[in-house]
């Protein structure tokens, strides 16, 4: 087993991120000391995955105000709000980003009695707490998910909802790591996940390094492997779950869910409760990020289509709740009716 890749670290008063745009060919860690640097790292996907984005943004708030010139507490709180609003513009779909920023802003607005120095310390403590919580949440998701798995089963996953998308274990991959600890032999199939190939460059990489049996397939092979009986379950992560159970996840997830439904294969969504957005009624209201055309037609520095081609490049799609067998959270497994049962998680 190779050395573990650590996507997020806090060292020497700086945020240290594994540059995931360079994987699997290079392992490079980069330090960030400003909110602007963190914003850019999120936007260009040096760090990606909803939980990891949230943790990084929380540290970004602290970095954005740690050098704030001493003035009044009210001016400092305004600066915290400004930095939070700025970081919120980095990527629009992952609700963990906004959840983490709201927590950081609340630290400032709920502790107006503290001095500026004390508020800075409190902001850093909150960012570290968000970081710690994520690891425990992921393990709990894995433990619940493992009750749906058995030794020897074939599991398909899409994109990367692994340890590289979180702080440890991942969400969709958490049961895979825990199964490995139990001595189980799961056979994982990882869609390469066009256009950025997170399934092949990230999921396959981290599972292989952990000694987990993983096979890479192209996105258009999913139907074939399902028809051959190789897949017993599908498990994916998510960037946002609407109140009715609709799920926004990496582009291509919708198609996988349709195939799973056709072949009567359980389709599971691993979702930390911070990704559940009860304020958004359905998937239709979830904003879908569109990214640059170059990701589709110039992925490897050479055009795979005419340079002038029109390109549509949504980064996410929405899987309707009807296609979802269960949503697996750190608090337990949620099944339909989702509108009613998701609410119970927060009561």
From Swiss-Prot:
Catalytic activity: 5-deoxy-alpha-D-ribose 1-phosphate = 5-deoxy-D-ribulose 1-phosphate
Catalytic residue list: 239 (proton donor)
Record EC number: 5.3.1.-
Superkingdom: Bacteria
Keyword Isomerase: yes
Record-marked site positions (Transition state stabilizer): 159
Annotated Pfam families: IF-2B
Pathway in which the depicted protein is active: Carbohydrate degradation
Key words, A-Z: Carbohydrate metabolism, Isomerase
Binding residue positions for substrate: 48-50, 91, 198, 249-250
GO biological process, one term: L-methionine salvage from methylthioadenosine
The UniProt record lists the keyword Lyase: no
GO MF term (any one): S-methyl-5-thioribose-1-phosphate isomerase activity
InterPro entries in alphabetical order: Deoxyribose1P_isomerase_DrdI, IF-2B-related, IF-M1Pi, IF_2B-like_C, Initiation_fac_2B_a/b/d, M1Pi_N, NagB/RpiA_transferase-like
Family statement drawn from the similarity comment of this UniProt entry: Belongs to the EIF-2B alpha/beta/delta subunits family. DrdI subfamily.
Role description: Catalyzes the isomerization of 5-deoxy-alpha-D-ribose 1-phosphate to 5-deoxy-D-ribulose 1-phosphate, as part of a 5-deoxyribose salvage pathway that recycles this toxic radical SAM enzyme by-product to mainstream metabolites.
PANTHER family with a match to the protein in the record: METHYLTHIORIBOSE-1-PHOSPHATE ISOMERASE
Record-given protein name: 5-deoxyribose 1-phosphate isomerase
Protein source organism: Bacillus anthracis
């Amino acid at each position: 087993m190779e050395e573990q890749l650590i996507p997020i670290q806090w060292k020497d008063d700086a945020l240290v991120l594994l540059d995931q745009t360079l994987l699997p060919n290079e392992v490079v860690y980069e330090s960030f000391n400003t909110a602007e640097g963190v914003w850019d790292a999120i936007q260009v996907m040096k760090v990606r995955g909803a939980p990891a984005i949230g943790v990084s943004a929380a540290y970004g708030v602290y970095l954005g105000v740690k050098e704030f010139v001493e003035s009044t507490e009210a001016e400092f709180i305004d600066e915290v709000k400004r930095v939070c609003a700025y970081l919120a513009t980095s990527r629009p779909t992952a609700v963990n980003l906004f959840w983490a920023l709201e927590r950081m802003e609340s630290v400032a607005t709920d502790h107006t009695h503290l001095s500026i120095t004390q508020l800075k310390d409190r902001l850093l403590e909150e960012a570290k707490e968000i970081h710690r919580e994520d690891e425990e949440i992921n393990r709990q998701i894995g433990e619940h998910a493992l009750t749906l798995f058995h030794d020897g089963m074939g599991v398909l996953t899409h994109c990367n909802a692994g340890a590289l998308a979180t702080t440890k274990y991942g969400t969709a991959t958490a049961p895979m790591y825990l199964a490995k600890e139990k001595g189980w032999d799961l056979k994982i199939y990882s869609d390469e996940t066009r256009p950025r190939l997170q399934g092949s460059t990230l999921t396959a990489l981290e599972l292989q390094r952990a000694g987990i049996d993983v096979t890479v397939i192209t996105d258009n092979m999913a139907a074939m492997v399902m028809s051959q009986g190789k897949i017993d379950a599908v498990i994916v992560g998510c960037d946002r779950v609407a109140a009715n159970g609709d799920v926004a996840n990496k582009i291509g997830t919708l198609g996988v869910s349709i195939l799973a439904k056709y072949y009567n294969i359980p389709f599971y969504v691993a979702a930390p409760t911070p990704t559940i957005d009860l304020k958004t009624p359905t998937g239709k209201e979830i904003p879908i990020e569109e990214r640059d055309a170059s990701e589709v037609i110039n992925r490897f520095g050479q055009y795979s289509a005419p340079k002038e081609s029109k390109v549509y490049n949504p980064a996410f799609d929405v899987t309707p709740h009807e296609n979802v067998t269960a949503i697996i959270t750190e608090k337990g497994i949620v099944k339909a009716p989702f509108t009613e049962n998701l609410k119970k998680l927060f009561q």
